[in-house]
Amino acid sequence: MSKTYHFIGIKGSGMSALALMLHQMGHKVQGSDVEKYYFTQRGLEQAGITILPFDEKNLDGDMEIIAGNAFRPDNNVEIAYADQNGISYKRYHEFLGSFMRDFVSMGVAGAHGKTSTTGMLSHVLSHITDTSFLIGDGTGRGSANAKYFVFESDEYERHFMPYHPEYSIITNIDFDHPDYFTSLEDVFNAFNDYAKQITKGLFVYGEDAELRKITSDAPIYYYGFEAEGNDFVASDLLRSTTGSTFTVHFRGQNLGQFHIPTFGRHNIMNATAVIGLLYTAGFDLNLVREHLKTFAGVKRRFTEKIVNDTVIIDDFAHHPTEIIATLDAARQKYPSKEIVAVFQPHTFTRTIALLDDFAHALNQADAVYLAQIYGSAREVDHGDVKVEDLANKINKKHQVITVENVSPLLDHDNAVYVFMGAGDIQTYEYSFERLLSNLTSNVQ
């Protein structure tokens, strides 16, 4: 295995996961990216994978080059050099589409919940049998002996179209990525095209009106909470501060009781989808049940830490539906605490398109603090929307804060702080953690 894989933009969540997976399969891997720290690079560094600054000297015609989708000749020296010198490269999704042909592949698509569900499916299946997987939180695992491959299937710019998996879950369809999709119908059409490429089994959330219209040549299995019209049904829910317990039926047949140590109704649905897929694929449900109990979650999805007796939750939620799910999970685990949301809107286009929905979602918290909008590299701020526009629509106690001054967050007793966003919301979180630590130091 002398070939070197070079990743242009290796810190991207999907790219870093793929790099780790290929490294673990015995391939030589390196990559390039900006110097700014990103949470995915820790895993790369621990694996001993070299991360270089962008430079045309990084490229060699004998390499297999995989390029992040955001990089073009006008914004990246390596892409420009490759184009000028006839050096071939594949985009992430193009490489993945050909890579998965050697496995029994299982995809997880959907507007929300992809990463958590991919993580759950990967965790369970890899404990049952040798499995390679790619999770959108930057986690990847590879094995030269794996028969199965689990991956996150991303709809943005229809990147999932090169994929033809045997099985796939679609968690939901929702209007997002307004910088690319023109309407909910456009989003549906993308998912419907993807669904037609599944070959053995498609598992969709049956209480999503859009998903009910999905068509596929593969058998379609619906899962949900409602007995009528769904194949896999979760019932007898018991939600507590230690997780969720529920029973699953398949077309009237009791498949037994299951427990997950995660929170929120959405995670019960994620687990039901995983159970349905693995049951249909012929796996022992006793093993599925056993390994669901130990699923601890994925990075930046309801990730908790305690600083000076203060609970801080970090979550990637950046769409109203995701915010509602995250706040629901926080209330399940901490029913007696005040839920304080600290949210950074991600992209101006999404903020404009979903402004009222964001306000409705954030009003599920007891208090709301807003960071300045985090603009995407793909867009320009034309001044059409400001974070104050969102603040004005929030009914609960609210305030706009800066990363330099997060002290207003101290105005709460017995609170859980839920930091949400897909930009650099973690810098606000770290600023708050330093403030809490300094308070203790001063007291001591």
Curated annotation (Swiss-Prot):
One of its GO terms (molecular function) is ATP binding. ATP binds at G110, A111, H112, G113, K114, T115, S116. Its main location: cytoplasm. It catalyses: UDP-N-acetyl-alpha-D-muramate + L-alanine + ATP = UDP-N-acetyl-alpha-D-muramoyl-L-alanine + ADP + phosphate + H(+). SUPFAM superfamilies: MurCD N-terminal domain (SSF51984), MurD-like peptide ligases, catalytic domain (SSF53623), MurD-like peptide ligases, peptide-binding domain (SSF53244). Pfam families: Mur_ligase, Mur_ligase_C, Mur_ligase_M. GO terms for cellular component: cytoplasm. It is found in: Cytoplasm. It comes from the Bacteria. One of its GO terms (biological process) is cell wall organization. Pathway: Cell wall biogenesis; peptidoglycan biosynthesis. Signal peptide: none annotated. InterPro entries: Mur-like_cat_sf, Mur_ligase_C, Mur_ligase_C_dom_sf, Mur_ligase_cen, Mur_ligase_N, MurCDEF_pg_biosynth, UDP-N-AcMur_Ala_ligase_MurC. Its EC number is 6.3.2.8. Keywords: ATP-binding, Cell cycle, Cell division, Cell shape, Cell wall biogenesis/degradation, Cytoplasm, Ligase, Nucleotide-binding, Peptidoglycan synthesis. HAMAP family: MurC. Belongs to the MurCDEF family. Cell wall formation. This is UDP-N-acetylmuramate--L-alanine ligase. It comes from Streptococcus pneumoniae serotype 2 (strain D39 / NCTC 7466). The lineage of its organism: Bacteria, Bacillati, Bacillota, Bacilli, Lactobacillales.
